Amino acid sequence: MYKRQVIRCWHSTDVAACPGSGKTTVLLAKLKLLADKMPLEKGAGICVLSHTNVAVDEIKNRLSDYADRLLNYPNYIGTIQSFIDRFVTMPYLRNISGQNVQVVDSLTYAQHMLSKMQHEAKYKALDYVTRSNFETGGQFSDRINHTQALHIRGDGALCIGKQKKPLAGVGKASAGQYKELLAELLKDEGIIRYQDAYVYASVAIDELPAEYTDLFSSRFQYVFIDEYQDCNNLQRQAIDVIFDPQKCAVFKIGDSDQAIYNSAEDTTPDWMPQPDFLPIVTSCRFNQEIANVICKLKKSEKNIVTLAGATGVKPV
């Protein structure tokens, strides 16, 4: 009953699943139904987003019989981060830098930074401060590793690694030169670090014009976000800004009891489905005796109803 309700729903909604509920199978069923309706009106497509390449590959492999209809333009199936990078962050960076931008590893980036610090007079203060800290600190084997550890703290101070004492305060020349150096590497050499992509994505999302976001809601008539409980703050913000649930059907599919936490510092709140969400509370993963124990640990009040028979061993 629960799965049928989700499969038959074609308007924006949250779908709250439970472990072993077969939500991926439900998603695939909806996609196959859409494939039979293609091409959609006005040349619109579908967008399917998940968190990992493994999950995306699984979806693509299980849709192989429908590849000609689902895996090509105007449809998009990929990770949430790749979607944000392709359609939000990179267009924004091309606009402000005037060239295609490449994301490089921190070692390569540090090599470019150090070269400019050592050879360009406008970074004299930054070179002096960082060289002095490297020579007296004794924590790093070479200046490349030392340069990789440089960062601007939340208050604007220039810091190194996890040291609490900054190398330079927010008003110091070296802190300002560090910011100028990062901006120059983007504008002149077209490179950023992986860690910078997150920051630029946040800025790009905030500056997205309404006309641009309207294009997404027009191009993608149906949007599916799998494992939504694992979305971080930036990804949730991007999805809410890019896709208008009044103009296209947005399905946020997840299980708040199976969220993956990236670190102790992660401030992303637990996902709480909207009050009118559709539940999938039937599970094939375990027996009812085990489900009854698991229910006591769940965040939601919905019980899990299993489709398996009784077990001969009661849970402890």
Predicted region positions:
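Conserved RecA-like helicase ATPase core segment
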Residues: 237-311
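Conserved RecA-like ASCE P-loop NTPase motor core of nucleic-acid helicases/translocases
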Residues: 42-56, 75-77, 253, 280-282, ...
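Conserved catalytic network of the ASCE P-loop NTPase/AAA+ motor domain
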Residues: 38-41, 69, 214-216, 242-246, ...
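Walker B catalytic acidic pair
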Residues: 227
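Alpha-helical scaffold elements adjacent to nucleotide-binding pockets in ATP/GTP-utilizing enzyme cores
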Residues: 30, 58-63, 83-87, 200, ...
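Accessory N-terminal region flanking or inserted into the helicase ATPase core
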Residues: 3-19, 25-26, 45-47, 122-224, ...
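P-loop NTPase Walker
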Residues: 3-95
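DNA-processing P-loop NTPase/helicase core
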Residues: 18, 86, 91-129
